[in-house]
UniProtKB/Swiss-Prot annotation:
This is Aspartate--tRNA ligase. It comes from Xanthomonas axonopodis pv. citri (strain 306). Residues 198-201 are annotated as: Aspartate. Catalyzes the attachment of L-aspartate to tRNA(Asp) in a two-step reaction: L-aspartate is first activated by ATP to form Asp-AMP and then transferred to the acceptor end of tRNA(Asp). It catalyses: tRNA(Asp) + L-aspartate + ATP = L-aspartyl-tRNA(Asp) + AMP + diphosphate. The gene is aspS. InterPro entries: Aa-tRNA-synt_II, aa-tRNA-synth_II, aa-tRNA-synth_II/BPL/LPL, Asp-tRNA-ligase_1, Asp-tRNA-ligase_1_N, Asp/Asn-tRNA-synth_IIb, AspRS_core, GAD-like_sf. Homodimer.
Length: 588
């Protein structure tokens, strides 16, 4: 139906006859001439219709051109010629196509929005097929496509084996809630959609495949936000006979090469590294954005002798923290704006937010100054590096909570005070805690997942020091986004059973849920490790968008709905009966 793509018509084709197909982006009838911007996935070319006096065929052609509306689907035949007025905004802007034939392949109904408009997100998702026609959306989807293609080429060239793992699998506790699928042939029993291929890729290592990868679809029934979807795509990788640096060095080289190939970005020749403890201490986050030149400063030793009980209680608590965040130029904040910072901190667990504000002339404004002697107050300001025109926020309380809300303030200040440097800031975060204590459940939970190996090989040591145990987990972070997470796995069945026990999973429950894994580990499992990268998140970073929904062709809303297909939707009673499911009436 076509000989060339619209966006690729150029000067080399001048004088030649071409056949094009695409959508009417714009049609302009100027009386004596019609101009049609014809669009396909490669771009736009101008089609010109010039009636010839006394020529019935050209008059009919002009009539067809004058009748065109937005997004009508056309096939156009014509001759390429040089344009009198060059359009530098188009790749085809030096030429035009003089139409000799126009066929309307399909008329478009009146549009809810035009391809060059950007309506609200609900409208975009309801008419996703129209939204995806927009040049910006085409660009972002192409970025994702190029990313996946480049990853496959890179790994295929290095003898990684692309192996599919099941979509219908066993429900196992991996952190988030499972999506369940009733098993028609086994009444009362269910499959689960995989949250990740974690256990299957480990079993592939036991099976001797050595180097595995998969562009895997994953499913987690959890609350949605700009960087999270119910179903998502990850590059899943696993290596046999490796230590942490073997995995890290390989994938660091891979990510560096992929960014260069896909978006022509040169990432650092060597990614910086820091432990989880250092990241939390300096930045209040296990995925710090190093483009923001602000750091938290511990001030517990300087406030122990103050008369401010909130500070002294935390400073004298072994599990407490008093941290300061200096914001250059922050003295410009009004009282209302300071309250907004306090409210933001409260979302992350802060019960209050103290501050010291220094005017450009050095005048102090602070609700806590009265609790310090003149000497100790001056020492505090010196320690945090405060100067005229700055504001210093203080957080006090439990170490983790203070780190969390002060880290959130750091990000907010970085954005609002334009303190985020241009460029790309990758890093490795390593040595994560093995466990964290869940107050509500009154037990340990795995910080990464239950299959991450501890840094110690001795089970007695792990049991005795579970609270402070360090794992062999690692994350790759880019501009404040965790783009990849992995670990060295447990390959000994006795260690895996011990970790289950520490997580409150008894031997009987472990056998019921993970018996297949424990059995596999008993038959000569090699040391192994791996990592998974979020394709959606990396594509969003490459495309320059904050929402992964922009790089997913058919995403869900934050309300977990597909507005285009109207999913989820009710199921007929006979279909439910076939899978032995009865739906309880909604509670009014």
């Amino acid at each position: 139906m076509r000989t060339h793509f619209c966006g690729l018509v150029d000067e080399t084709l001048i004088g030649q006859t071409v056949t094009l197909a695409g959508w009417t982006d714009v049609a302009r009838n100027l009386g004596g001439v019609c101009f049609i911007d014809l669009r396909d996935h490669e771009g736009i070319v101008q089609v010109t219709v010039e009636p010839v006096a006394g020529d019935d065929a050209s008059a009919e052609l002009f009539k067809v051109a004058a009748s065109l509306g937005y997004e009508d689907v056309l096939q156009v035949e014509g001759v390429v010629r040089a344009r009198h007025a060059v359009n530098d905004k188009l790749r085809s802007g030096k030429v035009e196509v003089i139409a000799t034939r126009i066929s309307i392949l399909n008329k478009a109904a009146p549009l809810p929005f035009h391809a060059h408009e950007n309506p609200g997100e609900e409208t975009r998702l309801k008419y996703r097929y129209l939204d995806l026609r927009r040049p910006e959306m085409q660009r972002m989807q192409r970025t994702r496509i190029k990313l996946v293609q480049a990853l496959r080429r890179h790994l295929d060239a290095r003898d990684f084996q692309d192996i599919e793992t099941p979509i219908l699998t066993k429900a196992t506790p991996e952190g988030a809630r499972d999506f369940l699928v009733p098993a028609r042939m086994h009444p009362g029993e269910f499959y689960a959609l995989p949250q990740s291929p974690q256990l299957f890729k480990q079993i592939l290592m036991v099976a001797g495949f050595d180097r595995y990868y998969q562009i895997a679809r994953c499913f987690r029934d959890e609350a949605l936000r700009a960087d999270r979807q119910l179903e998502f795509t990850q590059l899943d990788m696993e290596f046999a006979f490796v230590r942490e640096r073997d995995v890290q060095d390989f994938v660091e080289d891979m990510i560096r090469a992929i960014f260069k190939e896909v978006v022509d970005v040169d990432l650092a020749a060597q990614f910086p590294r820091m432990t989880w403890a250092e990241a939390m201490r300096r930045f209040g986050s296990d995925k710090p954005d190093l483009r923001i030149a602000l750091e938290l400063v511990d001030v517990a030793e300087l406030v122990k002798a103050s008369q401010f009980p909130v500070f002294t209680a935390a400073a004298n608590d072994a599990d407490g923290r008093v941290a300061a965040l200096r914001i250059p130029g922050g003295a410009s904040l009004s009282r209302k704006q300071i309250d907004e910072y306090a409210a933001h901190a409260a979302k992350y667990g802060a019960k209050g937010l103290a501050y010291i504000k220094l005017s450009e002339t050095g005048e102090v404004s602070s609700p806590i100054a009265k609790f310090f002697s003149e000497e100790s107050f001056a020492a505090l300001l010196k320690h945090v590096g405060a100067g005229n025109g700055d504001i210093v926020f203080f957080g006090a309380g439990g170490y983790t909570k203070v780190s969390d809300f002060m880290g959130a303030l750091r990000l907010k200040a970085g954005k609002e005070f334009d303190l985020i440097a241009d460029g790309w800031a990758p890093l490795w975060v390593t040595d994560f805690p093995m466990f964290e204590w869940d107050e509500e459940a009154q037990r340990y939970v795995a910080l990464h997942h239950p299959f991450t190996a501890p840094a110690v090989d001795d089970i007695a040591d792990l049991r005795a020091n579970a609270r402070t145990a360090v794992s062999r987990g690692y994350d790759m972070v880019l501009n404040g986004n965790e783009i990849g997470g992995g670990s060295i796995r447990i390959h000994r069945p006795d260690m895996q059973s011990a970790v289950f026990e520490l997580l409150g999973i008894g031997a009987e429950e472990a056998r019921a849920k993970f018996g297949f894994l424990l059995d596999a580990l008993n038959y000569g499992a090699p040391p192994h490790g791996g990592i998974a990268f979020g394709i959606d998140r990396i594509a969003a970073l490459m495309a320059g968008t904050e929402s992964i929904r922009d790089v997913i062709p058919f995403p869900k809303t934050t309300g977990a709905q597909d507005l285009m297909t109207d999913a989820p939707s009710p199921i007929a009673a006979d279909q439910l009966a076939e899978v032995h499911v009865q739906v309880r009436p909604k509670q009014v």
